[in-house]
Amino acid sequence: MTAPLSLFVTGTDTEIGKTFVSAAMLHGFARHGLRAAALKPVAAGAYERDGVWRNEDADQLDAAANVVLPPELRTPFLLKAPAAPHIVAAQEGVTLDIDTIVACHREALTRADVVVVEGVGGFRVPLTDTQDTADLAVALGLPVVLVVGVRLGCISHALLTADAIRQRGLTLAGWVANHVDPAMSYADENVATIRDWLAREHGAPLLGRIPHMSPAAAESAAAMLDIAALVETLRAAQH
Protein backbone atom coordinates (compact mmCIF):
# COMPACT_ATOMS: atom_id res chain seq x y z
CA MET A 1 0.00 0.00 0.00
CA THR A 2 1.38 3.40 -1.00
CA ALA A 3 1.93 5.83 1.86
CA PRO A 4 -0.26 8.94 1.70
CA LEU A 5 1.26 12.10 0.28
CA SER A 6 1.10 15.57 1.75
CA LEU A 7 2.43 19.07 1.16
CA PHE A 8 2.39 22.48 2.80
CA VAL A 9 1.29 25.42 0.66
CA THR A 10 2.71 28.83 1.47
CA GLY A 11 2.83 32.13 -0.37
CA THR A 12 4.92 35.21 -0.95
CA ASP A 13 2.27 37.29 0.81
CA THR A 14 -1.37 37.26 1.79
CA GLU A 15 -4.06 37.61 -0.90
CA ILE A 16 -1.90 36.14 -3.67
CA GLY A 17 -3.99 33.07 -4.42
CA LYS A 18 -2.85 30.34 -2.02
CA THR A 19 -6.38 29.02 -1.63
CA PHE A 20 -7.05 29.26 -5.37
CA VAL A 21 -3.88 27.33 -6.21
CA SER A 22 -4.50 24.82 -3.41
CA ALA A 23 -7.98 24.20 -4.83
CA ALA A 24 -6.50 23.78 -8.31
CA MET A 25 -4.05 21.21 -6.95
CA LEU A 26 -6.91 19.33 -5.27
CA HIS A 27 -8.74 19.14 -8.60
CA GLY A 28 -5.51 18.00 -10.24
CA PHE A 29 -4.86 15.28 -7.69
CA ALA A 30 -8.43 14.02 -8.10
CA ARG A 31 -7.96 13.84 -11.88
CA HIS A 32 -4.77 11.91 -11.17
CA GLY A 33 -6.91 9.26 -9.48
CA LEU A 34 -6.08 10.24 -5.91
CA ARG A 35 -8.39 10.79 -2.97
CA ALA A 36 -7.53 14.39 -2.12
CA ALA A 37 -8.32 16.20 1.13
CA ALA A 38 -7.51 19.69 2.39
CA LEU A 39 -6.46 21.11 5.72
CA LYS A 40 -6.77 24.82 6.46
CA PRO A 41 -5.58 24.56 10.07
CA VAL A 42 -5.83 28.26 10.90
CA ALA A 43 -8.39 30.50 9.23
CA ALA A 44 -8.95 34.13 10.18
CA GLY A 45 -12.23 35.59 8.99
CA ALA A 46 -15.51 33.77 9.55
CA TYR A 47 -19.15 34.27 8.62
CA GLU A 48 -22.23 32.67 10.11
CA ARG A 49 -24.70 30.67 8.06
CA ASP A 50 -27.53 28.60 9.51
CA GLY A 51 -26.00 28.98 12.94
CA VAL A 52 -22.62 27.61 11.83
CA TRP A 53 -19.42 29.66 11.57
CA ARG A 54 -17.69 29.15 8.23
CA ASN A 55 -14.68 30.46 6.32
CA GLU A 56 -14.64 31.27 2.60
CA ASP A 57 -11.18 29.79 1.99
CA ALA A 58 -12.15 26.55 3.73
CA ASP A 59 -15.36 26.44 1.69
CA GLN A 60 -13.32 26.73 -1.54
CA LEU A 61 -11.06 23.89 -0.47
CA ASP A 62 -14.02 21.68 0.43
CA ALA A 63 -15.56 22.36 -2.98
CA ALA A 64 -12.37 21.22 -4.72
CA ALA A 65 -11.55 18.18 -2.57
CA ASN A 66 -13.00 14.76 -3.34
CA VAL A 67 -12.54 13.80 0.31
CA VAL A 68 -14.19 16.38 2.55
CA LEU A 69 -13.00 16.32 6.14
CA PRO A 70 -15.19 17.27 9.11
CA PRO A 71 -14.89 21.04 9.76
CA GLU A 72 -13.27 20.55 13.17
CA LEU A 73 -10.58 18.37 11.57
CA ARG A 74 -10.10 20.49 8.45
CA THR A 75 -9.91 23.78 10.39
CA PRO A 76 -9.23 23.22 14.09
CA PHE A 77 -8.73 26.96 14.61
CA LEU A 78 -11.40 29.15 13.04
CA LEU A 79 -11.04 32.78 14.10
CA LYS A 80 -13.80 35.28 13.50
CA ALA A 81 -11.94 38.49 12.61
CA PRO A 82 -9.99 38.72 9.30
CA ALA A 83 -6.68 39.91 10.77
CA ALA A 84 -3.29 38.60 11.92
CA PRO A 85 -4.02 35.23 13.56
CA HIS A 86 -2.02 35.71 16.77
CA ILE A 87 -3.73 39.05 17.42
CA VAL A 88 -7.23 37.73 16.78
CA ALA A 89 -6.55 34.54 18.74
CA ALA A 90 -5.48 36.56 21.78
CA GLN A 91 -8.62 38.69 21.55
CA GLU A 92 -10.84 35.62 21.19
CA GLY A 93 -9.11 33.69 23.98
CA VAL A 94 -7.80 30.99 21.66
CA THR A 95 -4.36 29.37 21.78
CA LEU A 96 -3.14 28.34 18.33
CA ASP A 97 -1.56 25.03 19.28
CA ILE A 98 0.75 23.40 16.74
CA ASP A 99 0.47 19.97 18.38
CA THR A 100 -3.29 20.03 17.80
CA ILE A 101 -2.73 20.79 14.12
CA VAL A 102 -0.17 17.99 13.80
CA ALA A 103 -2.69 15.56 15.33
CA CYS A 104 -5.39 16.70 12.88
CA HIS A 105 -2.97 16.21 10.00
CA ARG A 106 -2.09 12.72 11.21
CA GLU A 107 -5.79 11.81 11.25
CA ALA A 108 -6.37 13.37 7.82
CA LEU A 109 -3.64 11.15 6.35
CA THR A 110 -5.70 8.09 7.32
CA ARG A 111 -8.61 9.30 5.22
CA ALA A 112 -7.01 10.33 1.91
CA ASP A 113 -4.23 9.56 -0.57
CA VAL A 114 -2.99 13.16 -0.51
CA VAL A 115 -3.53 15.99 1.96
CA VAL A 116 -2.97 19.60 0.94
CA VAL A 117 -2.20 21.77 3.97
CA GLU A 118 -2.72 25.46 3.28
CA GLY A 119 -0.88 27.86 5.55
CA VAL A 120 -2.11 31.31 6.52
CA GLY A 121 -0.60 34.44 4.96
CA GLY A 122 3.09 34.22 4.12
CA PHE A 123 5.71 31.77 5.40
CA ARG A 124 6.40 33.55 8.71
CA VAL A 125 3.06 34.59 10.16
CA PRO A 126 3.04 34.54 13.98
CA LEU A 127 0.69 32.03 15.57
CA THR A 128 1.71 32.77 19.16
CA ASP A 129 4.25 35.05 20.83
CA THR A 130 6.99 32.52 20.06
CA GLN A 131 5.85 30.34 17.13
CA ASP A 132 4.92 31.07 13.53
CA THR A 133 3.74 29.28 10.42
CA ALA A 134 7.31 28.28 9.58
CA ASP A 135 7.39 26.38 12.88
CA LEU A 136 4.13 24.72 11.86
CA ALA A 137 5.61 23.60 8.54
CA VAL A 138 8.63 22.18 10.39
CA ALA A 139 6.41 20.35 12.90
CA LEU A 140 4.47 18.80 10.03
CA GLY A 141 7.72 17.96 8.24
CA LEU A 142 6.23 18.45 4.79
CA PRO A 143 7.62 19.46 1.40
CA VAL A 144 6.57 23.02 0.59
CA VAL A 145 4.93 24.43 -2.53
CA LEU A 146 5.35 28.19 -2.87
CA VAL A 147 2.65 30.26 -4.53
CA VAL A 148 4.14 33.42 -6.01
CA GLY A 149 1.73 36.26 -6.59
CA VAL A 150 3.09 37.70 -9.83
CA ARG A 151 3.12 41.46 -9.35
CA LEU A 152 5.69 44.18 -8.82
CA GLY A 153 8.17 43.07 -6.16
CA CYS A 154 7.52 39.35 -6.54
CA ILE A 155 11.11 38.43 -7.42
CA SER A 156 12.54 39.47 -4.07
CA HIS A 157 9.55 38.07 -2.19
CA ALA A 158 9.95 34.70 -3.93
CA LEU A 159 13.71 34.43 -3.35
CA LEU A 160 13.48 35.53 0.29
CA THR A 161 10.70 33.04 0.99
CA ALA A 162 12.59 30.21 -0.71
CA ASP A 163 15.65 31.00 1.41
CA ALA A 164 13.53 30.98 4.59
CA ILE A 165 12.09 27.58 3.65
CA ARG A 166 15.58 26.14 3.16
CA GLN A 167 16.85 27.69 6.41
CA ARG A 168 14.17 25.69 8.25
CA GLY A 169 15.49 22.47 6.71
CA LEU A 170 12.45 21.99 4.49
CA THR A 171 12.27 20.94 0.85
CA LEU A 172 10.88 23.40 -1.68
CA ALA A 173 9.02 20.94 -3.89
CA GLY A 174 8.20 23.56 -6.50
CA TRP A 175 6.43 26.83 -7.07
CA VAL A 176 3.43 28.18 -8.93
CA ALA A 177 3.29 31.54 -10.69
CA ASN A 178 -0.16 33.02 -10.08
CA HIS A 179 -0.78 36.23 -12.00
CA VAL A 180 -2.63 38.56 -9.64
CA ASP A 181 -1.97 41.82 -11.50
CA PRO A 182 -3.22 41.66 -15.11
CA ALA A 183 -1.61 45.03 -15.88
CA MET A 184 1.87 44.10 -14.67
CA SER A 185 4.74 45.12 -16.96
CA TYR A 186 7.37 42.51 -17.88
CA ALA A 187 5.44 39.65 -16.29
CA ASP A 188 7.13 37.06 -18.52
CA GLU A 189 10.57 38.35 -17.61
CA ASN A 190 9.74 38.31 -13.90
CA VAL A 191 8.55 34.70 -14.05
CA ALA A 192 11.63 33.68 -16.05
CA THR A 193 13.93 35.29 -13.49
CA ILE A 194 12.26 33.53 -10.57
CA ARG A 195 12.25 30.24 -12.50
CA ASP A 196 15.99 30.44 -13.19
CA TRP A 197 16.97 31.51 -9.66
CA LEU A 198 14.82 28.95 -7.84
CA ALA A 199 15.97 26.16 -10.15
CA ARG A 200 19.62 27.08 -9.70
CA GLU A 201 19.60 27.80 -5.95
CA HIS A 202 16.95 25.35 -4.73
CA GLY A 203 16.37 22.81 -7.50
CA ALA A 204 12.72 23.84 -7.34
CA PRO A 205 10.75 23.53 -10.60
CA LEU A 206 8.02 25.81 -11.87
CA LEU A 207 4.92 23.61 -11.48
CA GLY A 208 2.63 25.86 -13.44
CA ARG A 209 1.74 29.36 -14.50
CA ILE A 210 -1.82 30.55 -14.01
CA PRO A 211 -3.00 33.67 -15.84
CA HIS A 212 -5.18 36.25 -14.15
CA MET A 213 -8.69 34.82 -14.02
CA SER A 214 -11.86 36.76 -13.35
CA PRO A 215 -13.69 35.01 -11.93
CA ALA A 216 -11.10 32.59 -10.60
CA ALA A 217 -11.77 29.03 -11.78
CA ALA A 218 -9.75 26.46 -9.85
CA GLU A 219 -10.96 23.56 -11.99
CA SER A 220 -9.64 25.26 -15.14
CA ALA A 221 -6.40 26.24 -13.39
CA ALA A 222 -5.78 22.60 -12.48
CA ALA A 223 -4.99 21.84 -16.12
CA MET A 224 -2.16 24.40 -15.97
CA LEU A 225 -0.32 22.57 -13.18
CA ASP A 226 2.14 19.70 -13.65
CA ILE A 227 0.49 17.41 -11.13
CA ALA A 228 2.39 14.33 -12.34
CA ALA A 229 5.72 16.02 -11.61
CA LEU A 230 4.50 17.16 -8.21
CA VAL A 231 3.32 13.67 -7.27
CA GLU A 232 6.70 12.27 -8.28
CA THR A 233 8.50 14.89 -6.16
CA LEU A 234 6.29 14.22 -3.14
CA ARG A 235 6.86 10.46 -3.41
CA ALA A 236 10.61 10.98 -3.70
CA ALA A 237 10.53 13.18 -0.58
CA GLN A 238 9.19 10.24 1.44
CA HIS A 239 12.42 8.28 0.98
From Swiss-Prot:
Does the record bear Oxidoreductase in its keywords?
Answer: no
Q: What is its main location?
A: cytoplasm
InterPro entries per record:
DTB_synth_BioD, P-loop_NTPase
Localization, per the record, is: Cytoplasm
Active-site residues, Swiss-Prot/TrEMBL: 40
Q: Which UniProt keywords apply?
A: ATP-binding, Biotin biosynthesis, Cytoplasm, Ligase, Magnesium, Metal-binding, Nucleotide-binding
Residue positions binding ATP: 15-20, 57, 118-121, 178-179
Question: Which cofactor does the UniProt annotation name?
Answer: Mg(2+)
GO-annotated biological processes: biotin biosynthetic process
- Cite a single Pfam family from the UniProt record: AAA_26
Quote the record's binding site residues for Mg(2+).
Answer: 19, 57, 118
Q: Which EC main class describes this enzyme?
A: ligase
- Disulfide bonding pattern of the chain: none
**Keyword Heme applies:** no
Provide a GO CC annotation, any one.
Answer: cytosol
The reactions it catalyses are: (7R,8S)-7,8-diammoniononanoate + CO2 + ATP = (4R,5S)-dethiobiotin + ADP + phosphate + 3 H(+)
- One of the record's GO molecular function terms: dethiobiotin synthase activity
Q: What does this protein do?
A: Catalyzes a mechanistically unusual reaction, the ATP-dependent insertion of CO2 between the N7 and N8 nitrogen atoms of 7,8-diaminopelargonic acid (DAPA, also called 7,8-diammoniononanoate) to form a ureido ring.
Family stated for the protein in its record: Belongs to the dethiobiotin synthetase family.
Q: What is this protein called?
A: ATP-dependent dethiobiotin synthetase BioD
